[in-house]
Every structure is written in C-alpha cells, then in structure tokens.
Amino acid sequence: MEHRSYMRGGPGPSIVPVALLLLLLSPHSLGAGTSQLAEERDVEILRKLPHNSSSFTQGLEVQGKSIFESSGLYGHSRLSEIDSQNGEIIRQVSIDDSYFGEGITVKDQSIIMLTWREGLALEFDISNFSIIGNFSFEGEGWGLCYNGEHMVTSNGTSELSFRDPNSFETDFTLLVTWDGNPVSNLNELECVDDRIYANVWMEDTILEISSNSGIVKSYASPISISSTQGKGPEEVLNGIAFDQDSGGFWITGKNWTEMYLVNFTISEVKLSPDESSVFPALVAASGVTIASAILLFRVILKKKEPETPNFKDSHR
C-alpha cells in the first residue's frame, strides 16, 4: 500500500510563497551587496608636534617614547630619533650620499631602512645608529613594515611583498584592491595586527588593508590637515606610525612643519545631492517590492482554500 500524507492535499499554506517573500526581502534584493566596499573614516586630531621641515619624510616608526623617522633624497638621506613629547630631535645620522633613504621598521634591536633604487636594505643598531648589516633585494624600495612574521614592502605598484625577516627573500606577494580595483602607488606602510596601513603616493589617502586578502577595508582622507601643509608638488602626505600607548597614529608629510597624532573614527553618513534624491526612490521601490510580495502571497493562499460551491450549478 502506498502511503500518502493527507497534508499534501490540504488547504495549508505552501512554502513557495514564503520562500519568495524571503527572497524579495533578502539583503541582496534590497541592494545590500556593497558590504565589500571600503568604509570611510574621519580623522580626529589628538595632538600636534613640531616637525623638521627639512625632512623629506619616507618612513615613521614609534618605539616607546621615541619616533624614528627616515628622510630621503640623494645627498640628504638620514635617520632621526624624535622625542614624542616635544618633537625635539634626540639624535640623527646621515647615510651615504649614493643612497636614497626610504621606509623604515623596527625589528628587535635593529632599525631596517630601505633604499629606493640601490637594491639594499640597511640595518642599524637602534642604540647607536651604527650600520651593522644589510640585505639585498630586487626592484625599488618604497614602504616597509614588520608584522612579527614577515617584512612587508611596497614598490610603488599595487602589490605588497612579504619577505623572510632573516634573508629578506620574498615568500609571497599580495595584490591590494580597493572596491575591486588594484591600487597603485602604495608607499609608506605600517603593520598593526592583521592590518597594513598605507599611504598612497601623491594622494591625501591612508588605506587600511587586510594582510590576508589584500582588500582595502577602510580609508581616510586627511585633507583638512594636508591643505595647511606642503606647498610644493612633492611635499605630500607620507609617514604613518602606530602609537601603542595612545592607540592612535602619528602622521606627517614631506617637508611638513608639524606631525599629528590622530584617530581614525567611523565616518558619519554623508549623502551627496544626487545620492539624497536617489535614496528615497530606492526606499520607495523597496516598499513596492514588499507590497507586491505580500499581495502575491495572499493570492496564492486564497487559491489554496476550498472553493465555495456555485449553488447555481449544483445538483444539490
């Protein structure tokens, strides 16, 4: 005997309209598929320090109460230690005129400094700034940070190289994308946990990048700061260092007169005039979609109900 459920022929509601309703109300149907888009961050200034305007800043790093800075240009490249309380230079050392200093990072008791086109990374003793070693690498050197496992370097392209900290050999590269598009001109870097913060050369932009996927998670545009600094075309925003004591970031630029301790805060939603006119239309369209789904749901349910006999045609 074939057993059939008596429920199959009953007038109960079908799962089809319910599924349809849920589909229409899902985030994807309402245009919420933008979760991969980078979020904007506001820049909150916490403190200011005077900055040596002769410094063509290439890298910043905070260690304790000191800020270490590398300055570039052939014949003018140097490494400096700055007091984070008053901005005074504690000490500095110039490097060979044939080297163009670039990004720096701290590893144990050493400071590593990239050079631009010389294919060398110089290792300094952090206690006395003497050069105690170097590493060779191919291509240009721009930004550098250390995440505890890899030395991460940029070369002005959209790729970051993750290097063995002992040999400086490249273990792998990571393509950086912003809303699905590669980001070129990646410059100064700062590693913080599983994130990499990057300046973009010639732009007033700081990116927060996932070191796992290369996707830009958020961005900040400190235009209110950079608009008061740097009058020449080369005097751009560059230099970012995480300050563990305050939880903020020190930022500055090439030949700027000040350094700024900032926080990146969640940005308030600001709609442009065009977006303001589109948003109500999207809401209205969503309302129509929901209303249509409910109406369809009711129609299907009604068709499932037993029909009342047409007594005009009934034999009873």
Per-region residue spans from a language model:
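Secretory targeting signatures
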Residues: 1-36, 189, 269-316
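A short helix->beta-strand "capping" segment at the edge of beta-propeller domains
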Residues: 35-54, 86-88
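Beta-strand-rich domains and repeat architectures in extracellular enzymes and scaffolds
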Residues: 46-78, 93-105, 253-255
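Surface-exposed loop and turn segments in beta-propeller and other repeat-based domains
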Residues: 47-50, 90, 94-97, 173-182, ...
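Beta-rich, blade/repeat-based domains predominating
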Residues: 53-64, 97-108, 137-148, 154, ...
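Conserved beta-strand positions in repeat-built beta-propeller and related beta-rich domains
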Residues: 68-74, 106, 111-118, 153-157, ...
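Short loop/turn segments that connect beta-strands within beta-propeller blades
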Residues: 82-87, 125-129, 165-168, 210-214, ...
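Blade-level signature of beta-propeller repeat domains, shared across WD40, Kelch, NHL, RCC1
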Residues: 239-273
